[in-house]
Design a protein with these regions (language model features):
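N-terminal accessory targeting/assembly segments
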Residues: 1-73, 78-82
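P-loop NTPase nucleotide-binding module
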Residues: 85
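Conserved hydrophobic/aromatic pocket- or pore-lining residues that grip, position, or stack substrates
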Residues: 89
């Protein structure tokens, strides 16, 4: 399971991580999620609460989980979350 800090950082997208119907979640800009369903179909969801501050906090939390650093001078990070979800972050500092 996820610890409280990780669960809080993932809260805005948790509803899309839990169902096994999604094979990929892409966030290319704040407030917009793109979801790939296992059938290969894509959908876009507007999620205003997924703002820049929330995304940055998620990236820092994910990096900390695996002993990496995510900062303005190091804005690229790849890791796996507990549960095996792959995360790739390229920050827009």
């Amino acid at each position: 399971g996820l610890n409280n800090v990780t669960a809080r950082a993932l809260a805005p997208i948790a509803q899309f991580i839990e169902p096994e119907i999604y094979s990929e979640i892409i966030i290319n800009r704040p407030g917009v999620l793109q979801l790939e369903i296992h059938t290969g179909d894509w959908s876009t969801i507007n999620l205003p609460e997924l703002d820049q501050a929330v995304l940055e906090e998620f990236a820092r939390t994910a990096a900390n989980l695996v002993g990496q650093l995510y900062t303005p001078s190091n804005p690229i990070m790849t890791c796996k979350l507990p549960g095996g979800h792959r995360v790739q972050v390229v920050g827009g500092y």
